[in-house]
From Swiss-Prot:
Pathway: Pyrimidine metabolism; UMP biosynthesis via de novo pathway; UMP from orotate: step 1/2. It comes from Vibrio atlanticus (strain LGP32). Catalyzes the transfer of a ribosyl phosphate group from 5-phosphoribose 1-diphosphate to orotate, leading to the formation of orotidine monophosphate (OMP). Keywords: Glycosyltransferase, Magnesium, Pyrimidine biosynthesis, Transferase. Orotate binds at residues 34-35, 128, 156. This is Orotate phosphoribosyltransferase. 5-phospho-alpha-D-ribose 1-diphosphate binds at residues 26, 72-73, 99-100, 103, 105, 124-132. One of its GO terms (molecular function) is orotate phosphoribosyltransferase activity. InterPro entries: OPRT, Or_phspho_trans_dom, PRibTrfase_dom, PRTase-like. Belongs to the purine/pyrimidine phosphoribosyltransferase family. PyrE subfamily. Its cofactor is Mg(2+). GO terms for cellular component: cytoplasm.
Length: 213
C-alpha cells in the first residue's frame, strides 16, 4: 500500500465517510463497513479528494484525453480531479459531465464542459451494480469516444449475484481497466498495521471470506 492510499483511508475515517459497524447494503448483505463519499462535502474536503484521485491516475499510467463525471456524484469528482491534475501534476486535462435531462435551449444537449472525444477516463465514487457505468458508456459511444478506464474511490472486491464483482463484470463487458484509490485488501492491510481495531479487522476478514472475489 502506498502512502497516498494510507492517507486516503485516514482521511475517509476522519470525515466519517468510511465507517465500521453493521450496515445493510442495497443487496441485503450485512456489511461490516460502509463508504459514503457524499460526506466529502466542503471545499477543503473536495480539494483533498481531488488530490487522491489525481495521485491514483498518475500512479495508473493510463493515458486519456478527457475526464468524465457521470451525474450526479461524478460531477464534483471530475471537477476537483481536473483541478488537482493541473495544480499538482502540471497536466491540464479537459473535463465533461452529463445532465440527467437534456436542455433544449441555450447550448442545449446533455453534456456540459469539453467535447467528449478521444480516450475517456470516467471518475465516480464507487461501482455497486455497474448501472451508472453502462449508462455512461452509451453517452461515450454516442459521441464516438472510447472508454480508457474507470477510477473509483474504493473497490469492495466482493461478488455480485454471480462469481464476479461488479467491477470485474464492467471490465469483462467493456474491456477497460477499472482502478481505485483503495481496495478492500488495502483496508485490511491498514487495520492490520494499525493494530487497534481487532474486532473490526476480524469482521472485515470474515466478510471478505464469505463474499470476496
Amino acid at each position: 500500500m502506498k502512502a497516498y492510499q494510507r492517507e486516503f483511508i485516514e482521511f475517509a475515517l476522519e470525515k466519517e465517510v468510511l465507517k465500521f459497524g453493521e450496515f445493510t447494503l442495497k443487496s441485503g448483505r450485512k456489511s461490516p463497513y460502509f463508504f459514503n463519499a457524499g460526506l466529502f462535502n466542503t471545499g477543503r474536503d473536495l480539494a483533498r479528494l481531488g488530490r487522491f484521485y489525481a495521485a491514483a491516475l498518475a500512479d495508473s499510467g493510463i493515458e486519456f484525453d478527457v475526464l468524465f463525471g457521470p451525474a450526479y456524484k461524478g460531477i464534483p469528482i471530475a471537477t476537483t480531479t481536473a483541478v488537482a491534475l493541473a495544480d499538482h501534476h502540471d497536466v491540464d486535462t479537459p473535463y465533461c459531465f452529463n445532465r440527467k435531462e437534456a436542455k433544449n435551449h441555450g447550448e442545449g444537449g446533455n453534456l456540459v464542459g469539453s467535447e467528449l472525444e478521444g480516450r475517456i477516463m470516467l471518475v465516480d465514487d464507487v461501482i455497486t451494480a455497474g448501472t451508472a457505468i453502462r449508462e455512461s458508456m452509451e453517452i461515450i459511444q454516442a459521441n464516438g469516444a472510447d472508454l480508457a478506464g474507470v477510477l473509483v474511490a474504493i473497490d469492495r472486491q466482493e461478488k455480485g449475484k454471480g462469481e464476479l464483482s461488479a467491477i470485474q463484470e464492467v471490465e469483462r463487458d467493456f474491456g477497460c481497466a477499472i482502478i481505485s484509490i483503495v481496495s478492500l485488501t488495502d483496508l485490511v492491510t491498514f487495520l492490520e498495521e494499525k493494530g487497534t481495531d481487532a474486532a473490526h479487522l476480524e469482521s472485515v476478514k470474515a466478510y471478505r471470506a464469505q463474499y470476496g472475489i
